[in-house]
Amino acid sequence: MPELPEVETTLRGIAPHIEGKTVEAVVLRQLKLRWQINPDLGEILSGRQVLSCGRRAKYLLIRFQTGVLLIHLGMSGSLRIFTPSDGRIGRPDRHDHVDIVFSDGTVMRYRDPRKFGAILWYEGIEEHHPLLEKLGPEPLSEAFCADYLYARLKAQKRAVKLALMDNAVVVGVGNIYANESLFRAGISPHRPANRLKKKECALLVETVKAVLQRAIETGGSTLRDFVDSDGKSGYFQQEYTVYGRHNQPCPRCGGLVVKETLGQRGTFYCPNCQK
């Protein structure tokens, strides 16, 4: 599943190509994603200019004068940009569900083999959208700090990994990056969240930010379907310390990495290094 670094990588790839441009047409080949796409999306967007592009949690936000298009990549989605300088635009296959065509010939194509993503038009205040209004702070923002995390966790008895993956606590820290951050902080994923000391919260905040920033720099992780807007794979998976490394040596102590299930998600950690 594309997580925050993959979505941020996508944002940085598409924004320079579509900001300031006017939509000419929308080609809808498949309406049934996680939620059905508005069949009138072409009529709604045609003639509108993209003012800016942004991201909130794992949602891409394409902003227009009187509304915003929310795009979620789901389990297997990606956005690809084709420009006039590319020559012939790639022929769509059965997983290429939506093309947004701009007046200069640029095409933004949404691909989603598993169809768990979403493309939603909203004309209200962006922050009040039901999918956005209850989200926690961005992990790379100043709002996500030791004081904040310590205050949020001190009343929570659940495992710290589950708390870290809760979008009401902090957005965008998915399974891969929660595993990696907890290892680098030396904190067991099973530790009750309210048992973390203030200095441990500070260290965890620091490692979350470092892991996510490094993942963005390397184009995110490509495990199955994710590619960036140029069709290229990310390579942060080459730097995994524990994720996907069950029964392999811990890079820190040489002991074996363990895989368990926590909250129905694969959880990788080193019992020796993480307490």
From Swiss-Prot:
Keyword Transcription regulation found: no
Binding partners and assembly: Monomer.
Alphabetized InterPro entries for the sequence: DNA_glyclase/AP_lyase_DNA-bd, DNA_glyclase_Znf_dom_DNA_BS, Formamido-pyr_DNA_Glyclase, FPG_cat, MutM-like_N-ter, Ribosomal_uS13-like_H2TH, Znf_DNA_glyclase/AP_lyase, Znf_FPG/IleRS
Residue positions of the active site: 2-3, 58, 265
Xref: SMART domains: Fapy_DNA_glyco, H2TH
Keyword Glycosyltransferase recorded: no
Protein known as: Formamidopyrimidine-DNA glycosylase
Binding, DNA: 95, 114
Native species: Neisseria meningitidis serogroup B (strain ATCC BAA-335 / MC58)
Reactions performed catalytically: Hydrolysis of DNA containing ring-opened 7-methylguanine residues, releasing 2,6-diamino-4-hydroxy-5-(N-methyl)formamidopyrimidine; 2'-deoxyribonucleotide-(2'-deoxyribose 5'-phosphate)-2'-deoxyribonucleotide-DNA = a 3'-end 2'-deoxyribonucleotide-(2,3-dehydro-2,3-deoxyribose 5'-phosphate)-DNA + a 5'-end 5'-phospho-2'-deoxyribonucleoside-DNA + H(+)
HAMAP family xrefs: Fapy_DNA_glycosyl (MF_00103)
